[in-house]
């Protein structure tokens, strides 16, 4: 079977985009495992499926699968690529969209569109802090998991937990370049403290409006960027009195601008097409 796709990225967080309406019988989890393998297939951090909405009040529905085949609730860089895909493929002429995700309705706005690249601002919704909402397995439920001690090997870390529709664990460090992101990230992701696993962000504070971030994504490993992670990290920094309300997040794949005024979080960043193609996949 021949499958059409588009390869896109948002600040280096790369995705394979597929119009799911054309392939209603595909196992998308299996497809993600097949296509996201770097060096052996197309290679990507995740697979994004474009679908019609379940409600007439919304525009489209997004499903996103990590490289390991697990389905994610939401992805900040992915939702920007999703909006860019819709415009590039003439599936919409609207600038503001209502997209159904497992994390709820997300509203991206196409600020500018220039052929293969867009600048997109996304209302990411409100962050959640209660331990049961993230979720975090803590005996005494907390309104905010702030600087909670977690031992990794011989190292004791202070973690902060925020949900942006998906779970994030934020750790403030002096120098992100000195952190074994792969080792610590994998251990924290699979720690029994997190029944649904967790994304892990390591944050170096540059100033009140600037941070450096490294990320270990649940189900994908080290990536060049994570939009929901950038949002969660800025929110955690503000909650800890370390950051102002508008922050630039420096990631290996580029910069994201995050704003939080105690209600909804807004993220602004690019989305870019890399190429389109077709690949033969085995059914069944």
From Swiss-Prot:
Entries under SUPFAM superfamilies matching the protein: Diaminopimelate epimerase-like
E.C. number: 5.1.1.7
Reaction it catalyzes: (2S,6S)-2,6-diaminopimelate = meso-2,6-diaminopimelate
Localization of this protein: Cytoplasm
Annotated GO CC locations: cytosol
Lineage top rank: taxon: Bacteria
Active site: 75 (proton donor), 226 (proton acceptor)
Record-stated family: Belongs to the diaminopimelate epimerase family.
Function: Catalyzes the stereoinversion of LL-2,6-diaminopimelate (L,L-DAP) to meso-diaminopimelate (meso-DAP), a precursor of L-lysine and an essential component of the bacterial peptidoglycan.
Complex formation: Homodimer.
Name used for this protein in its record: Diaminopimelate epimerase
Species annotation: Halothermothrix orenii (strain H 168 / OCM 544 / DSM 9562)
């Amino acid at each position: 079977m021949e499958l059409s796709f588009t390869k896109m990225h948002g600040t280096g967080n790369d995705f394979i985009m597929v119009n799911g309406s054309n392939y209603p019988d595909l196992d998308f989890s299996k497809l993600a495992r097949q296509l996201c393998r770097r060096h052996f297939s197309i290679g990507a951090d995740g697979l994004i499926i474009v679908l019609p909405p379940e409600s007439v009040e919304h525009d489209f529905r997004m499903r996103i699968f990590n490289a390991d085949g697990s389905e994610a609730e939401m992805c900040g860089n992915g939702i920007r690529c999703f909006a860019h895909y819709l415009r590039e493929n003439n599936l919409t002429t609207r600038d503001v969209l209502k997209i159904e995700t497992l994390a709820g309705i997300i509203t991206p706005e196409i600020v500018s569109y220039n052929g293969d690249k867009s600048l997109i601002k996304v209302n990411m919704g409100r962050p959640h802090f209660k331990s049961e909402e993230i979720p975090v397995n803590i005996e005494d439920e907390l309104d905010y998991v702030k600087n909670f001690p977690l031992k990794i090997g011989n190292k004791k870390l202070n973690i902060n937990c925020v949900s942006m529709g998906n779970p994030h664990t934020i750790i403030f460090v002096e120098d992100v370049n000195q952190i074994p992101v792969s080792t610590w990230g994998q251990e924290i992701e699979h720690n029994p403290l997190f029944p649904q696993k967790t994304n892990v962000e390591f944050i170096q504070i540059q100033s009140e409006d600037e941070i450096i971030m490294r990320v270990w994504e649940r189900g994908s490993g080290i990536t060049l960027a994570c939009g929901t992670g950038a949002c969660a990290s800025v929110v955690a920094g503000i909650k800890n009195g370390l950051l102002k309300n508008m922050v630039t997040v420096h990631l290996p794949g580029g910069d994201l601008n995050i704003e939080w005024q105690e209600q909804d979080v807004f993220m602004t960043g690019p989305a870019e097409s890399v190429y389109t193609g077709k690949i033969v996949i085995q059914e069944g």
